[in-house]
Amino acid sequence: MDAVSMYKYQREAWKRPKDSYVGELLKERLPKWRKGPSVQRIKRPTRIERARRLGYRAKPGYVVVRVRVPKGGRRKSRPKKGRRPKRMGKNKFSPGKSKQWIAEERAQRKYPNLEVLNSYWVGEDGQYKYYEVIMVDPYHPQIKSDHRINWICQKSQKGRVFRGKTGAGKKARGLRKRGKGAEKVRPSLRAHRRRGK
């Protein structure tokens, strides 16, 4: 089986995890991931075909981090001071960003010297969702000399995940849509008083 067909086989298996060998792998791995740290650096990607499509290369300067994010709505703490229940502002609040984007931000805070390139889903159970985040060292000589990735060394890419410049961030900002119906997502949601989404 050549490399192209192997990647295609893996891609099809991950599309329907429960119907393929992936389901058995996740049953084995998820309990271990649940017990481990919430942000953990790993040696190599779990989904090599997905990681490579998103820009990962097996060379120095690339780092893969697995992040665990709790499922469900936002956990807002209850205000200590008194007020009527209507003004508590505790329930039914949404963070306005996906779990994947939150996972990318957590990886960035853990490794502030790296930059987030992209991320992908690797599993979920009743409590958590798990994502793998591809990170790049913009100061590494091999990254600086690689014309395919050295754009991430520019100053304008610093802290890109916090400004919604990754794939998950752009999706949450509504930037996948163009033309009719997307008049209020550009130049930004804030410029249109959050009416774009």
From Swiss-Prot:
InterPro entries reported in the protein's UniProt record: Rbsml_eL15_core_dom_sf, Ribosomal_eL15, Ribosomal_eL15_arc, Ribosomal_eL15_CS, Ribosomal_uL23/eL15/eS24_sf
Coiled coil: none
GO biological process, one term: cytoplasmic translation
Residue numbers spanned by region Disordered: 70-99, 163-197
Bias kind Basic residues: ranges: 70-90, 163-179, 187-197
Keyword RNA-binding recorded: no
GO cellular component term of the entry, any: cytosolic large ribosomal subunit
Pfam families cross-referenced by the UniProt entry: Ribosomal_L15e
Listed GO MF terms: RNA binding; structural constituent of ribosome
Entry keyword set: Ribonucleoprotein, Ribosomal protein
Assigned protein family: Belongs to the eukaryotic ribosomal protein eL15 family.
NCBIfam families from the UniProt entry: PRK04243.1
Name the record gives this protein: Large ribosomal subunit protein eL15
Native species: Methanopyrus kandleri (strain AV19 / DSM 6324 / JCM 9639 / NBRC 100938)
